[in-house]
From Swiss-Prot, chains A, B:
InterPro entries: CinA, CinA-like_C, CinA_C, Competence-induced_CinA, MoaB/Mog-like_dom_sf, MoaB/Mog_dom. SMART domains: MoCF_biosynth (SM00852). This is CinA-like protein. Belongs to the CinA family.
Length: 425, 425
C-alpha cells in the first residue's frame, strides 16, 4: 500500500497564528479518494529543520505532499532546503521564468527581482504547472519518496492537488479508489455509551467505525473499503441505527439544523421560533443556510419577561404563577410565536443556562421546550445538570430541533435520550 | 534552550474531518508565554505509528505535549502506545480509578466498563489531574524528553495546559517568565494594510508584533520580552492605536460582542435588537456571556416582511416604497424594537447576505444598519461585495456593535473603515 504523508511549512501555521485549514482540506480530499494520510509534520521556516524533515520522512513514505514555502520572500525556503537535502544545486527553470515574466506583463506590473527566486528549482526537480499563481510546483525523488511541493495559497494548492497531484499518484501507484462512507449524527449519548452498543456488533470485513465529537452531537462514521464491504454498507448502517434507537437523528448531515433546513426548504411549510435561554441559537443556525428565508418567518429572542408578554402575548399571570422556566410559559411562548404570522410550526425554549440563576427546584440546566403546531402543542422540561452554559444551550437547541424533526416524520415528538433527564409533568 | 514539540493524535484530526484548533490554541498560548514550538507531528490511531513517533521525537525534544487518545474507546491508545514505546506495562492507577467512580456516582450514572481503561497508565507515569473530565493526564520521561499527555476535549486540554503543563515546564526548565502581551482588536482593514501602517514604526528592542485573523476581526498582538520592553508597552500600544485610527475597536478582548457585553453589564442601560440578515447573530453573541440578561431585553429576528410589520411596527408603505434593505426600513426596525420595551438602545440590520437575492441597485453584500437611542436614530448602508454569506453577516454584526460602542463613548457613531464601502444617503 502506498504510504502518503504531508509536511506543512510556515511559522504562522506552526505558531498557531493561523489554523491549518490546508492540512484539513488535503486530508479530507484524499479520504474521499480512499487514501489515508499516515502522518503530518508541521515545521517552521528554519532551513535546517526543513532539510532534516525532508531527509527523515523520505525514508518512510512513498509520497509526501509538501505545502508552503514557495513564495518570493526570504522566509520561503522549501526549494533551497530540498536541494540541500538531496545534495544538489538550485538551477533556473527557463520555462517558469518565462511564465513569471508573462504573468507580470499580463497583469501590467513590473516583476520584482525577488520573484526570480520562484523559478529556481532543485537540479533533479520535475516542474509542476501552476496556472493560477506565481509559485511553481515541483516534485523530487529522494530515498523512497516522491516529495511533491505545492503553494501555501489555498486556492493554488487546491487547483494543483486536483489537476496535478491526484492524477500523478493515480498513475504512479495504480490506485484503487473503492471506498464509501456513511455518517450518522447522534444526540443524547456519550461516546463511550455509543461505543458500548456498537462494539459488540460483528462487523463484516472492510467495515470500520469512527467517532467524532462535535457537541452537542457525536458523529458515527462507518467506513467501507472494497466492493464487498460497500455492498454491505446499507445493511450495516440499518443495523447500527436499530441498535442506537432515538440517538440517531440524521444521516450524512453535519448538524440537526442542517437536517431541519433540508426538510423545510421549499416544503411550503413555515417556522417561527421564540427563544429565551438558547438566545437566538436555533434561529441563527438556520439562517446560516442560504434559502432559509423560504420557511423561517421570525425568531423572537424574548430574553426578558416583559418581552415575553409584549411580543409573544404570554399571560403575566402565567409568569407569576409558574415562572419563566415552566411548561405553561414555554407553551404560551410557542403558541404566541406561531400565532403572530400563522406559521405551521413554532419552537420555544426557556431555561436556566447558568452558571448562575438556578434554584433548588429548578437548578442550572433546567430547560422547558415546546413545539406548537396547527393542531396543538407538545412540551417537555429537561434536566442538563453539570453542563457548561454553552452546552446547556446547544443541547436544548438540538432537542428542540429533534422535536420538530420527529413531528415532520409523524413520529412520537417526545422521546427519551440516554444522557438527558426529564421532569415529570 | 528548551526544545518543545507537539504530537497530535487522532484519525479525525489527521484525516481533516476536524480542523486542529487545539494545535493552534496550544501554539499561540505558548507564544504568549514566550515559548516557540519547534515541530508538530500529527498521527492517526494506529498503535505502531504512535510508538514510532514517541520513540523518535523523544530523541530530539525536551518536552513533548501529546494531545488526544485518552478516551475510553478502542481507538484511544496513547497510554498503551507510550507503555510499549518505553517497554513497560500498563498498571491501574488507584487514585484515578477512585476519581472515575466518584465522578460517575456524582453524575448519577453507572460507570461503563470501557471507562476503566482510563485509569490504566504506563508504569513509570506521573499522574496529572484533570478535575474537569474523565481522561487522566500523565507524564513519562523517555530518552531526552518529558512526554506530557493531555485530553483531546478542548476545554479539558486548556484547563490542563494552564493549571498543570505551564507550571510544570516553568519549574522543570527554570523559565524566565518576563513576557507581556497587549492585544488590539481591529475591524475593516486587511492584514497587509495593517502591516503597511505598523511596519514603518521603529519598535523598541524586545517588542514584536503578530497578527491573527479571526474574521470579521484581525487581532494585533504586541509582545514585550524583558522588563525594559514591558515598561515601554503602554507607550508603543498608544502609538499603534494612533496610527490605526478607527480600525482599533477593543483592547484585550476577543470580539466586539465581548467589548459591548463588558460595557453594558450592570450599567443599568438596556438594549434591544432587531435583526434581519444577521439572523440572530448579534443577539446570540451577547447571550453567549453569562449575565447578558441584565441588559439585553430582546432580540427580534424579523426575517420576513410580515414579521417586520407585525412585530416591529414597520409601516408597510415604507417596505413598499424603499424595500426591506433600506435606510428607512432599518430605521423603523430599530425605533420599533426600542419602543416595545422602552429600551435605552436598539440595533437593527437588514441586508442581502447572499449568495442569491442581489440586484443591480442593491447587490449581495448591501446591508443597512441602524442604532436607535432615546434621542434619535443613526443609520448607514454599507457595501460588502465579494464576501461570503457568513462574512457579510459577521462584518455587519461587527459594524452594528461598533456603532453602539462609539455611542457609549460619545464618539461619532458612523465612521469610515478602510475595507468597507458605504452608500451615500
Amino acid at each position: 500500500m502506498m504510504k502518503l504523508e504531508m509536511i506543512c511549512t510556515g511559522e504562522e501555521v506552526l505558531s498557531g497564528q493561523i489554523v491549518d485549514t490546508n492540512a484539513a482540506w488535503f486530508a479530507s480530499t484524499m479520504m474521499e479518494h480512499g487514501i489515508e494520510i499516515q502522518r503530518r509534520v508541521t515545521v517552521g521556516d528554519r532551513l535546517e529543520d526543513l532539510i532534516a524533515v525532508f531527509q527523515e520522512r523520505s525514508l518512510h513514505a512513498d509520497v509526501i505532499l509538501v505545502n508552503g514555502g514557495l513564495g518570493p520572500t526570504s522566509d520561503d525556503m522549501s526549494a533551497e532546503a530540498m536541494a540541500k537535502a538531496k545534495g544538489e544545486s538550485l538551477v533556473e527553470n527557463r520555462e517558469w521564468r518565462q511564465h513569471l515574466e508573462d504573468w507580470f506583463t499580463r497583469n501590467n506590473r513590473e516583476m520584482p527581482v525577488s520573484n526570480l527566486k520562484q523559478a529556481m528549482l532543485p537540479e533533479s526537480a520535475v516542474m509542476v504547472d501552476n496556472p493560477v499563481g506565481t509559485a511553481c510546483g515541483f516534485r523530487v525523488k529522494l530515498n523512497r519518496a516522491w516529495l511533491f511541493f505545492t503553494p501555501g495559497v489555498p486556492f493554488e494548492l487546491k487547483h494543483m492537488v486536483k489537476e496535478q497531484f491526484i492524477p500523478f499518484i493515480r498513475e504512479e501507484f495504480d490506485l484503487d479508489a473503492k471506498v464509501a462512507l456513511k455518517k450518522l449524527l447522534t444526540i443524547g449519548h456519550g461516546e463511550s455509551s455509543l461505543a458500548d452498543k456498537i462494539e459488540p456488533l460483528e462487523l463484516p470485513e472492510g467495515i470500520t467505525i469512527g467517532y467524532r465529537s462535535s457537541m452537542p452531537h457525536i458523529e458515527i462514521k462507518i467506513f467501507a473499503r472494497g466492493e464487498k464491504a460497500i455492498a454491505l454498507l446499507p445493511r450495516v448502517t440499518g443495523h447500527i441505527k436499530m441498535v442506537l434507537g432515538t440517538a440517531v437523528v440524521a444521516e450524512d448531515k453535519a448538524t440537526l439544523a442542517e437536517e431541519i433546513h433540508t426538510k423545510l426548504l421549499n416544503s411550503g411549510l413555515t417556522l417561527s421560533v421564540a427563544e429565551s435561554c438558547t438566545g437566538g441559537m436555533i434561529t441563527s443556525q438556520l439562517v446560516d443556510f442560504p434559502g432559509s428565508s423560504s420557511y423561517l418567518q421570525h425568531g423572537l429572542v424574548t430574553y426578558s419577561n416583559e418581552s415575553k408578554v409584549r411580543v409573544l402575548g404570554v399571560n403575566p399571570a402565567t409568569l407569576d404563577d409558574h415562572g419563566a422556566v415552566s411548561i405553561p410559559t414555554v407553551e404560551e411562548m410557542a403558541k404566541g410565536a406561531r400565532a403572530i404570522l400563522d406559521s405551521d410550526f413554532a419552537l420555544a425554549t426557556s431555561g436556566i443556562a447558568g452558571p448562575d440563576g438556578g434554584t433548588e427546584e429548578k437548578p442550572v440546566g433546567t430547560v422547558a421546550i415546546a413545539l406548537a403546531t396547527r393542531s396543538g402543542v407538545y412540551s417537555q422540561m429537561i434536566k442538563l445538570p453539570r453542563r457548561s452554559r454553552d452546552l446547556v444551550r446547544s443541547l436544548s437547541a438540538a432537542v428542540a430541533y429533534d422535536m420538530l424533526r420527529r413531528e415532520l416524520l409523524t413520529e412520537a415528538v417526545i422521546v427519551d435520550y440516554q444522557s438527558i433527564g426529564r421532569f415529570s409533568k
